[in-house]
């Protein structure tokens, strides 16, 4: 998992040749912290096929307006420069362990769907 800043956002996310899953978070958000370990495990599972990243909205508040982020954690998927907010389930189900399997299912069915055909 990489840390994205406004300085490297364009290069790391928008210009990426591989799909990116970006978590918008803040240091004081316990749910965001819980997703860090999920993102690390997902990165290990999928390797170089996907880029998992996080951006701290406290350090980069401008990003909230750019992507119309209302709260954290928010997860967006970027493919070929296009952004889509991930329609993940509401807490607490998502954060009680269900989240990791949901993200794997999403990655497999939406991001790598052509690889399975």
Label for each model-derived stretch:
Residues 2-5, 24, 36-43, 47-62:
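Thiol-based oxidoreductase modules, predominantly thioredoxin-like and allied folds used
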Residues 34, 66-68, 93-94, 110:
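Chalcogenol-based redox active-site neighborhoods
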Residues 77-117:
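Non-catalytic, surface beta->alpha helical segment in thiol-disulfide oxidoreductase systems
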Residues 15-27:
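Short active-site neighborhood of thiol/selenol oxidoreductases, capturing the structured segment around
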Residues 9:
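Substrate-binding pocket helix/loop in short-chain dehydrogenase/reductase
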Residues 29-32:
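Short cysteine clusters
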Residues 67-79:
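Structural micro-motif
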């Amino acid at each position: 998992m990489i840390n994205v800043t406004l300085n490297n956002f364009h290069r790391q996310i928008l210009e990426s040749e591989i799909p990116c899953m970006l978590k918008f978070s803040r240091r004081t958000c316990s749910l965001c912290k819980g997703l860090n370990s999920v993102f690390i495990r997902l990165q290990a599972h999928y390797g170089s096929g996907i880029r998992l990243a996080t951006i701290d909205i406290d350090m980069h508040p401008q990003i909230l307006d750019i992507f119309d982020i209302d709260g954290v954690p928010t997860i967006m998927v970027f493919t070929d420069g296009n952004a889509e907010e991930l329609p993940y389930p509401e807490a607490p189900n998502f954060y009680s362990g269900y989240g990791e399997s949901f993200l794997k299912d999403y990655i497999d069915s939406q991001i790598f769907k052509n690889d399975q055909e």
